[in-house]
Swiss-Prot record:
Domain DFDF: 453-489
GO cellular component, one term: P-body
Location of the motif TFG box: 534-554
GO biological process annotation, one example: negative regulation of translation
Name under which the protein is recorded: Protein decapping 5
Pfam short name (any one): LSM14
Lineage: superkingdom: Eukaryota
GO MF annotations, alphabetized: mRNA binding; protein homodimerization activity
InterPro entries linked to this entry: DFDF, FDF_dom, FFD_box, Lsm14-like_N, LSM_dom_sf, Sm, TFG_box
Organism annotation: Arabidopsis thaliana
Region (Disordered): 111-153, 183-238, 264-301, 318-362, 396-455, 519-611
PROSITE patterns: DFDF, FFD, SM, TFG
Amino acid sequence: MAADNTGSKSSSAADSYVGSLISLTSKSEIRYEGILYNINTDESSIGLQNVRSFGTEGRKKDGPQVPPSDKVYEYILFRGTDIKDLQVKASPPVQPPASTINNDPAIIQSHYPSPMPTSGSLPSTASGSLPDISSHNGQPGQHGMGFQNAMPLYQPGGNLGSWGASPQPPMYWQGFYTPPPNGLPQLHQQSLIRPPHGLPMPNSLQQPLQYPNFNTPPPPTGSSSLQGSSLPEAPSSLFPFSTSSQMLAPSSLPFPGLPPVTLSSSLQSTLQSAPSPSLASEMAPPLLSNKAPITAPPTLPQDTNLLSFSLSTTRATEASTGLPLSNKPSVVTGPISPPQTTPLTSAPVAGVSSSISQDKPKPLLVTPGQLLQSGSSAVSLSPPSTNADKDVEVVQVSSSAGLEQSVPVTSEAQPPILPLPSSARPTQKPNGHSFPNHNGYRGRGRGRGRGAGRSHQVMKFTEDFDFTAMNEKFNKDEVWGHLGKSTTLDGDEDDDSPTVDEAELPKIEAKPVYNKDDFFDSLSSNTIDRESQNSRPRFSEQRKLDTETFGEFSRFRGGRGGRGGYGRNNGYSRGGYGGRGYGGYGGRGGGGGGYGYGGRGQGRGVSNRTT
């Protein structure tokens, strides 16, 4: 019992320092400063919020010194065994006792600004940033969260005045909203980034947010026409500034810490002609849902001008009503007729980042007939006035005629998006002959091609090849006579080629080329001749043997011409491209050393020719 009493006394004494400014030095000689959040005696841990590191400050004896850091950490949990020194630099501010006015059962809700604390620390400043919105007997709107046990995800607005001595870590700040006058439960608001009083908000965060939910009516103080109306309070960045605008005093706004809002004359007339606060009860049922309520059509009268709302508000309205986003044009402005079922469009204020308008989906490509059908449901707009708000950017005015001109007609014949393949486009040469990628080019003579420009295509066979019928059509005597003639013509030109006696030509006996009954046929007969002669066969013999075996080798061949025809020579008909090569002459126009030398420079072979 004595130990329990001692532990309870020590824990209560430690809890009394919660909210104090603590200077903590670790065993690594690094000093930290932050607000004491909790002390866990069981785990020997200390939690600080809004912690900043000041480095070693010259205390480290060995090794490099750790420089201070300007980064402020929201929460750090320290291990008690690694803490070298702990000092309390400032005690938590003394909370004034609760006023006795809250004990009156006739009071449903009270609202008064909290006094500014004297301490300059961040959490104590945050504790006095928002007015006290607490109500009597803990109404259902209060989000009761145990700050001693868990880290809150957002700052609840209902129990700002009932924290006691333990301020919360400022993880997220809540947006503008005030409880309705009839004591409705406070809703789950979107986590808008709103810094505490006295902390500046970056400009990059002020523009894209645009305050999606600003439709909750202010508390019924009745001090001015703005607070008595049911119009939502809107931030000053949503309204265009004009020369005839009027300034609202900060005292007339529900939050005294806010900057004065500049409103144009059209908005002021709207506020003065707005309905009475009795509409607040009519707006209560939509507030009970988690969806974003429809803001503009129920509250604005029909004879007023719609000011420029942000694009996020329009999106929230369309998300709650289930209307499509693709039917609306990009951005429009102008007076709007009585509320309809079509989505509202808006114009951005000058200075708002253009990334908001880029997020909107673009309209699909449709025909003019479809535009005429969808144009009947568009919001009727008149041309924008030029003498009023001149700093509003008019990006596009919506009308069915304008959309018809901007959308191309898809039924017209259009050129292909991608260019045609290079093989399908024959190139016209200056000499009148076309050479599509050198496919099907048949060189003849000295580079003047005879090809008809046909592209090389792969033949598709539908039946098996008939060898017997093709053998009957093949006339070997005609081919051999043609070869003999070419040999005689070329014999006079080259005296260095080896001489072959005509008497030696008929040494090879005529044998059938293919015999099904024999295992060996005439295809392998040259090995017997080589064994008998013990030397390489002569060129004329080899050429005749190859002709009998394979026929005219390069007659229907399109490729690169082979090694100079059929002789075992050094002729190279490189790049014949369909040239006719006979023997070792490389073909006519196909390269090689025969007559018709070099079809467009596609072969420079030299072959050993016989007489």
